[in-house]
Amino acid sequence: MKELALKYGCNPNQKPARVFMEEGELPIEVLSGRPGYINLLDALNSWQLVKELKQATGLPAAASFKHVSPAGAAIGLPLDDTLKKIYFVDDVNFELTPLASAYARARGADRMCSYGDFCALSDVCDEATARLIKREVSDGVIAPGYTPEALIILREKRKGTYCVIQIDPAYTPAPIERKQVFGVTFEQGRNEVRLDDPSLFEDIPTKNKTFTPEAKRDLIIALITLKYTQSNSVCYVKDGQAIGIGAGQQSRIHCTRLAGSKADEWWLRQNPKVMNLPFKEKIRRADRDNCINLYIGDEAEDILSDGAWQQFFTEQPEPLTREERKAWIAKNTGVALGSDAFFPFGDNIERAHRSGVEFIAQAGGSIRDDHVIDTCDKYGIAMAFTHVRLFHH
């Protein structure tokens, strides 16, 4: 197939719309549903991300995309009981394969932002992964293939309208890419930088120069995730998965704050008070996500006040106080942080430290690199200058 007609472009008034190849065949096949313009932007960006994660780590990878940026990305490490519970997969009666674990991590890291996502899988989608996908509100999935059992499950989702896309894993695009803006054609070489190159971690200006193998792995995950995130962007990673992604901010510190707040929320969801919230039976997953988001934030009264809590809980929960939240966040350690460009000031490091960051990879090159390094040394953070910028637009 050389061309795929679309219902419309970014918005319903933008017609006609299509995706096509100037030479050769499209590398994708639509197995179910009718993907839209933004669906395909998400699909093709997310596929590149998971493909590179698999190449870099050797493990199955998954990503959850919304509006051409990842809400989550992860590799297939096993889930402990706590993570199973906060990702809402503790009730499944089947074994989680490595690919299913990667999907649960990617989809579960920022559940509010992943609502209505497009997901990507590095490996052939198996039945376990398809069964997890079927439970979530999602627009579609892209993968290099599907087992017969998985395809049956996914084709039943959304009454047969769920988008299922198969991509040729051997497809390699041309080295030059083009796009038009306001009738003007832009052309550039594809960003083919390898982010698992060991030389990226050789320039370590901080006093602490120790990166554990797990820290390097997590920093590579952060950098690959940022490569496909709208700039400016910052990514916090722990235990093989992104736990906070700040995308599309004009200010670097706002990226760091946004991603840090998401990382804090991921960690707060593991607080015993949150994990033991007395939800009513059969409450919708989206309502549960929203309640948790409010409960651990500054607007908890919206669900805890009389007349409100009865809608969601069997009994009125005790509040999670600011002091309790701060104390719990302080327990988070071993977090890795990547940035798609240099940190201009040390305030980014101050904010990152509050979310448990101990390892950083960033381009370097700010006129205030000295201040950034001094702030890292203040907290014993190991930081590498990669000398690689990862802007994405």
Say what each PLM segment does:
Residues 1-199, 215-233:
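Active-site loops and adjacent core secondary-structure elements that bind or stabilize anionic groups
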Residues 117, 121-122, 135-165, 170-172, ...:
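C-terminal binding/interaction regions
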Residues 124, 203-214, 343:
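Bateman/CBS regulatory modules and CBS-like beta-alpha motifs in cytosolic regions of diverse proteins
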Residues 56-64, 164-167, 231-238, 268-279, ...:
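Flexible, glycine/charged-enriched surface loops at secondary-structure junctions
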Residues 22-34, 109-115, 188-209, 286-309, ...:
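Gly-rich Lys/Arg/Thr-decorated short loops/hinges at beta-loop-alpha junctions or inter-strand turns
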Residues 71-112, 243-342:
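Glycine- and Gly-Pro-enriched alpha-helical subdomains that act as flexible
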Residues 52, 228, 265-269, 354, ...:
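Conserved helix-loop functional segments at active or binding sites
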Residues 69, 125, 238-241, 343, ...:
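Active-site-proximal loop/turn and secondary-structure-junction residues that shape catalytic pockets
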